[in-house]
Regions:
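Beta-strand-turn-beta hairpins that frame and shape the catalytic cleft
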Residues: 1-6, 106-117, 158-162, 213-219
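Active-site-proximal segments of metal-dependent phosphoesterases and phosphodiesterases across multiple
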Residues: 128-136, 141, 157-199, 205
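Active-site environment of divalent metal-dependent phosphoester hydrolases
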Residues: 14-17, 45-50, 54, 72-82, ...
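Active-site neighborhood of phospho(di)ester-bond hydrolases with catalytic His/Asp-centered motifs
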Residues: 8-9, 37-42, 67-74, 119, ...
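A short C-terminal boundary segment appended to hydrolase-like catalytic domains
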Residues: 242-298
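Conserved beta-sheet core of the metallophosphoesterase superfamily
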Residues: 177-245
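N-terminal active-site segment of His-dependent metallophosphoesterases
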Residues: 1-63, 79-80, 145, 149-152, ...
């Protein structure tokens, strides 16, 4: 069974979001016909009510087309309210939960896939502390307990379902930024591979990516729909197609002249058991929309 996922990230409502791009996305959503829409965090800029309200409006529009799974990013966590109280983290997510529900790690089950999320945005936490002051509350942390929970979900799912892991922080190094989104990233990568995930959806770095982790896990890193792109690149979102034998990731890039998103590069990976490998043949692009053609920013 084929599963198609529209992968968005880093919208940054609150001054950075490009409203023309948001409108174009809303118009083309029905024509893309995804089975689900996944938003991998940073819906807001400063975790303010008005920013979350605008982000929720977009999620509600997307939900008319397909189920939507949303997770918080580091910008959605009001870490400054309790920066040094590690046991008082729940208030940090209060505003986010008001608009997107109490569950910070939702799971979505489709006929052909189980999509499980893990929380990497904790504000200031022991697991994400680094020697770089600019990374205070920016770096992510992927705790062992999170991956153990996800692995339990994957282990109990029917074999024919693709295993998709959703996190905010980029799990591979950005080509332009040369930065890892996660602290203790080597440990995190090993845990991801061991979890049984076949596909990872992430964002944070404001640069699109389609790569393999550990030689077998397909990683879709979505760009951003805000005005602060990495290296001045066009804004992007990803369209992920999971087939029984392959995974395809297509970038939709913003075209300034037409003011529309257009399908551009497509990357293909062959599915081998519960893993993947680069596929030698190019993949076809996803269905083209009728109404539209087709960064520390973190």
């Amino acid at each position: 069974m084929t599963v198609q996922l529209l992968h968005l990230s880093d919208l940054h409502f609150g001054g950075l979001a490009d409203l023309d791009q948001i409108e174009a996305l809303e118009q083309m959503l029905p024509d893309l016909r995804p089975d689900a829409v996944v938003v991998t965090g940073d819906l807001s800029q400063r975790a303010r009510h008005g920013e979350f309200q605008r982000a929720r409006a977009l999620v509600q529009v997307a939900a008319r087309t397909a189920p939507v799974l949303v997770i918080p990013g580091n910008h959605d966590v009001a870490w400054w309210t309790r920066p040094l109280i590690p046991l008082a983290k729940q208030p940090l997510y209060a505003k986010y939960r008001r608009y997107f529900g109490a569950d910070l790690v939702p799971t979505l089950t489709l006929p052909g896939a189980i999509i499980a999320s893990a929380l990497t945005s904790h504000g200031v936490s022991w697991g994400s502390l680094t020697l770089q002051l600019r990374d205070l509350a920016v770096k992510g942390h992927l705790p062992k307990r999170e991956l153990a929970r996800v692995r339990g979900l994957f282990d109990s799912a029917p074999r024919e379902q693709a295993r998709v892991l959703v996190v905010h922080h980029n799990v591979l190094r950005g080509d332009i930024s040369r930065r890892m989104g996660l602290a203790r990233w080597r440990q995190a990568q090993r845990r991801i591979v061991a979890s049984g995930a076949e596909v990872v959806l992430c964002g944070h770095d404001h640069e699109e990516g389609a790569e393999l982790l550990g030689g077998r896990v397909v990683v879709s890193t979505a760009g951003t729909l805000c005005k602060r792109t990495r290296g001045g690149r066009p804004s992007t979102f990803n369209f992920v197609t999971i087939e029984p034998t392959a995974v395809h990731i297509t970038y939709f890039r913003w075209d300034v002249e037409s003011r529309r998103f257009r399908a551009s590069d497509t990357y293909a990976f062959a599915r081998v058991g519960k893993g993947a490998a680069p596929a030698p043949a190019p993949a076809p692009p996803p269905a083209q929309p009728v109404s539209a053609d087709t960064t520390s920013h973190s």
